[in-house]
Amino acid sequence: MGYRKYVTGIEIAMSKINDYTALGPLVGFVYQIYYFLYRLLTIQDGETVSLEKIDDVGVEIGEKKTYLQLKHSINSKHLTIKRMAERDINLWKTLNMWVCIIKKQGDEAAQRLWIANSEFVLISNKSAENNRFFEMVEAYKKDDNNWEELEKFVSKQAEKEPKEECDGDKKKNIYLYTKNVNDYALKKELLKHVTVEFESDDELREKINREIQYKKFVPEKRVSDVRYILIGEITDSVVKGVTSYTIESFAEAAAAL
């Protein structure tokens, strides 16, 4: 029951987030834990799912890696879903971070191989609807002939250098991020492996509930209780330093609850 009290308090905080914006970092962490649980509930044979190892959440199987960067945003003024803009700082910060990770893997040949064995996914509760950049990325992934349009768009973003004193650190950072991405020699290969997914708090919670009910055969009336327990157990394990699971180790941990 302690876990239930703890997690219920957090879920109440999430529902009140528009009134208490100072809870932003906490809710962002809870969003990450929820997504971590979802990936654990859908783990496949041979996979290792981790938290804060290769990315916010990571999935590894053999040489293959999936980098999952989570960005949770709070709309403090309205209850509507926020839209991710083409120059959203979290978007370009994430792309820049992935570029930095790849560059650490060695020479260009090693980086190229790393990209080929990796998928890079930005998970956000901001909507990607009508985002031209994402639309162009998806079009390019389907047809290489669309690369030129995407390349021009990225190049244009990198040209928007802020004025020295007027635009502030945020715009300067966006400029640096866009420039680093644009200057990266293998950006064409990288963007072929980039995906953006929209996951609202409610949708993520519902996906977890469905996995618990229909995949784990838990009666509907017990689904919320099981979710509370799993979230509490995972949070406790993370505090103790357990941040990676295989399908076997997660099954063992869940069976002990």
Question: What is each of the regions a protein language model found here?
Answer:
Residues M1-P25, S73-L257:
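Acidic metal-coordinating catalytic centers involved in nucleic-acid phosphodiester chemistry
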Residues I17-L26, V30-M97:
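Catalytic centers of nucleases
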